[in-house]
From Swiss-Prot:
Belongs to the bacterial ribosomal protein bL21 family. SUPFAM superfamilies: L21p-like. The keyword Ribosomal protein applies. It comes from Lachnospira eligens (strain ATCC 27750 / DSM 3376 / VPI C15-48 / C15-B4). The lineage of its organism: Bacteria, Bacillati, Bacillota, Clostridia, Lachnospirales. It holds the Pfam family Ribosomal_L21p. GO terms for biological process: translation. Part of the 50S ribosomal subunit. Contacts protein L20. It comes from the Bacteria. This is Large ribosomal subunit protein bL21. InterPro entries: bL21-like, bL21-like_sf, Ribosomal_bL21, Ribosomal_bL21_CS. Keywords: Ribonucleoprotein, Ribosomal protein, RNA-binding, rRNA-binding.
Amino acid sequence: MYAIIATGGKQYTVSEGDTIRVEKLAVNAGDTVTFDQVLFVNNGEAKVGEPTVAGATVTASVVGEGRDKKVIVYKYKRKTGYHKKNGHRQAYTEVKIEKINA
């Protein structure tokens, strides 16, 4: 059984037992989070949402939080001496999928 969920402006294909990194959520480690934007569920028969599957939820437990590797943003304009270097580290929340309710 697997499902496609939407969170943080992105879509993730998940199965029970999977560990995924999603955009930062305002939760603590050990908490339980429920994703109710389930776009697709396949448990032997496919259920496609319009836009979401009615009554379907995905329950996950929060493993931890962190920050991704640094991405360097470098701006440069020739002949003017203009250059600018900036770094960015995106925060994420790591969750473990416990149950898919469809």
